[in-house]
Amino acid sequence: MKTPFGKAAAGQRSRTGAGHGSVSVTMIKRKAAHKKHRSRPTSQPRRNIVGCRIQHGWKDGDEPLTQWKGTVLDQVPVNPSLYLIKYDGFDCVYGLELHRDERVSSLEVLPNRVASSRISDTHLAEIMVGKAVEHIFETEEGSKNEWRGMVLAQAPVMNTWFYITYEKDPVLYMYQLLDDYKDGDLRILQDSNDSPLAEREPGEVIDSLVGKQVEYAKDDGSKRTGMVIHQVEAKPSVYFIKFDDDFHIYVYDLVKTS
């Protein structure tokens, strides 16, 4: 299955494994974002599109124009131009500046907002969040692979879906995990370290890194910069990062370095 904007993604991603969940990053002083693409000038305040269905064109360089349809999940408070989007038929959550990115064309907000759905098992949903899990995927050949990951939160807007990330592929995904659990394709790992309360001393406050600019050194010596856009409530040391050169949302257990 093709992935939005020519990028590889999980479920759709090959799941060959890339990266890990715990990295060291360096906080850097806030500065102008690197211009990886052209952006439109800021205009007057726009309507709130969170919870709306959208469709738009996408054209990057000499690539052909393609059309995409999806649901706007969230508007990032520390960068209100940035929206989190779940595109139809794809499992990754994407971050795009919908009104500013000139690769986006003919953005249309569709008439009906996404209707709220009833959670089939609220108790299981509460137990699942913040837990390490093994998630089973079936390959095209019919074999099954187990992927260890962590359930991060119940997704906004599409509330029968859950945010999840994987040790070998630390990108933000979302699936209907209650269904997977009942089908035997998701197993909650009984690990005492999974409790967020076990990570804190009584009265301890974990400083938030949300809004901080970060620099990430890759294995090949190159560096990429980005912004911490969200702290996971169930695991306060875990954050979402949006890098300047990518529209995937990365999930890392951050270790602050000087």
From Swiss-Prot:
Entry GO MF terms: histone H3K4me3 reader activity; methylated histone binding
Stored InterPro entries: SPIN/Ssty, SPIN/Ssty_sf
Region (Disordered): 1-23
Region (Histone H3K4me3 and H3R8me2a binding): 138, 246-248
Region (Tudor-like domain 3): 210-255
Histone H3K4me3 and H3R8me2a binding, annotated site positions: 169, 176, 180
Domain of life of the source: Eukaryota
Residue numbers spanned by region Tudor-like domain 2: 129-178
Coiled-coil annotated residue ranges, if any: none
Transmembrane regions listed in the UniProt entry: none
GO biological process: gamete generation
Residues covered by region (Tudor-like domain 1): 50-99
Protein's job: Exhibits H3K4me3-binding activity.
UniProt xrefs under PANTHER family: SPINDLIN (PTHR10405)
Assembly description: Interacts with C11orf84/SPINDOC.
Record protein name field: Spindlin-3
Source organism (scientific name): Pongo abelii
Gene that produces this protein: SPIN3
